[in-house]
Amino acid sequence: MRILADKNIPHIFKLFGLHNTVTICEGRGISAKDVRDIDILIVRSVTKVNKLLLDDSSVKFVGTATAGVDHIDQNYLKKYGINFVYAPGNNAVAVVEYVFSALLWLAQRGRFFLRDKIVGIVGVGHIGSLLNERLRNFGIHTLLCDPPLEKINSSKPWKSFETLVAEADILTFHTPLIYYGDYPTWHMVDIDVLEALPSNRILINTCRGSVIDNNALLKVLENGKKLNVILDVWETEPELSLPLLSYADIGTPHIAGYSTESKTRSILQIYNAYCNFFNIFNVINLSALDSPVIYYLRVQKEIDETLLHKLVKFVYNIQYDDVILRRFAAKSGGFDKIRKHYLARREWSSLRVETYIDSNNEILTKLGFNVCCV
């Protein structure tokens, strides 16, 4: 079979190259001509998969190595019997650790304690639920908002979005991008929400850029409103508002989910679906794709926020990604070039922590570190 894949997806040849003809290319440049004679298409969020791309093609199977699917016309795929698979939840650990890293950095810079703050989580799917779990495991109070889930399961202590805007010190968004229907998320944070938001709040967006009206956000910041802003996603990507970037406390190029481990989990999910769909025996030794522990530390004092921040920075320094974006954002194609050449970070599980303190063992294990009691 003939496979076309985004060149920035790892392990493509190792997984699919044994009995197939595999071609890789830039995801944003994939055209109808490229897929005309292709059987299998594997993409990321930068490729729009729709009628314009797939009409007159021989594509039978589409996989996207992403949790979001707003770049995929699923109705079209269903209409023409094209099998589709995506990778929900596989980037959850990476995104949660990105958010936690950003919050720890802000807390250290602002000299406040996260345990004194209330975190409002908007969207409590794979990512939001894991973030809630980890924050609570570290003693941080959370408020949850997810109207579609509340409709299905009313037993949780759900809060309205208006309550989060009024009461949460920190708002972090983990929703899909939905334009219509009962629960649209497009411009969920508009000028009215931003003006109602108390000063000195923290806004974090790692889901889709258009969940926050970027022009409205820039307007209130230019008018002097004091907000801390962490943006990994932007409206009109790969272009972004340079003035808005100048106001952001942390700005990164849509890489919150870009860990080595998350990329491997995502493509493995697509590979397994491919094997099932085409009735192919899975001969891959999955252990060959495992990412080994690469850092070792011994901790001899009880974990607090300052020490946790040091451990996190040992694995991933979020300031580095912020500096890189600011350096190249104004250059032609800079946003995509950073993503293309991004040195995928490791997750906290890559850090082997040795400690003789029982409470450290419990806390660090729940936060996702690789812990060994000594």
From Swiss-Prot:
One of its GO terms (molecular function) is 4-phosphoerythronate dehydrogenase activity. Its main location: cytoplasm. Substrate binds at S45, T66, Y258. The keyword NAD applies. Its EC number is 1.1.1.290. It is found in: Cytoplasm. The keyword Phosphoprotein does not apply. SUPFAM superfamilies: Formate/glycerate dehydrogenase catalytic domain-like, NAD(P)-binding Rossmann-fold domains. Keywords: Cytoplasm, NAD, Oxidoreductase, Pyridoxine biosynthesis. Catalyzes the oxidation of erythronate-4-phosphate to 3-hydroxy-2-oxo-4-phosphonooxybutanoate. Homodimer. This is Erythronate-4-phosphate dehydrogenase. The gene is pdxB.
